[in-house]
Regions:
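N-terminal helical cap/lid subdomain that shapes the substrate entry/recognition surface
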Residues: 2-91, 99, 110
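Structured helix-beta-strand junction loops
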Residues: 43, 99-100, 124, 131
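Substrate-recognition "cap/lid" segment bordering the active-site pocket of phosphatases
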Residues: 106, 110-144
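A generic structural signal for short
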Residues: 80-81, 102-103, 132
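A structural feature recognizing the 12-helix transmembrane core of secondary solute carriers
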Residues: 97, 103-105
Length: 144
């Protein structure tokens, strides 16, 4: 019997909050990073609502609305491939594979982001489903 384990990538495997907060602090200053992160959390679902934007476009538009200068509106998209996994994740994923589990990612991002993050994780996945390719962001039913 094949056993599958599915994961969200960002916030589960990759430290999304840490990565985005560091970049927001770089762009807006550490004193404003938490407020900008809270505002980002409000903006993201609105920007994903129709399912037609790539995640790169979501990140860029969010930064524009947060007031980033033109030169930094793509800062989150540029930095995302470098965001680190949570420390315990690579070993846990490898253990799951060693025990016969097949690994899959369901993500609200784009293929290039997932491929970069999978490389950082250092453990192969059998499958990755990304929002832009299916025209749906979680938690919409179409994503499942």
């Amino acid at each position: 019997m094949k056993r599958w384990a599915t994961f969200d990538c960002y916030g589960t495997l990759i430290d999304w909050n840490g990565g985005i907060r560091r970049e927001l602090a770089r762009v807006f200053g550490d004193d404003h990073a938490d407020d900008k992160l809270a505002r980002y959390h409000d903006l993201e679902p609105e920007l994903q609502a129709d399912g037609t934007r790539s995640y790169r476009e979501v990140l860029t538009e969010a930064m524009r609305r947060l007031g980033a200068p033109d030169t930094d509106q793509d800062a989150l998209a540029r930095s995302l491939p470098d965001w680190e996994p949570f420390p315990e994740v690579p070993a846990a994923l490898q253990e799951a594979r060693d025990r016969g589990w097949k690994l899959a990612i369901l993500s609200n991002t784009d293929r290039d982001f997932i491929e970069a993050s999978q490389a950082r994780l250092g453990v192969p996945f059998e499958l990755a489903i990304v929002a832009f390719e299916i025209g749906s962001y979680k938690p919409a039913h179409r994503h499942w």
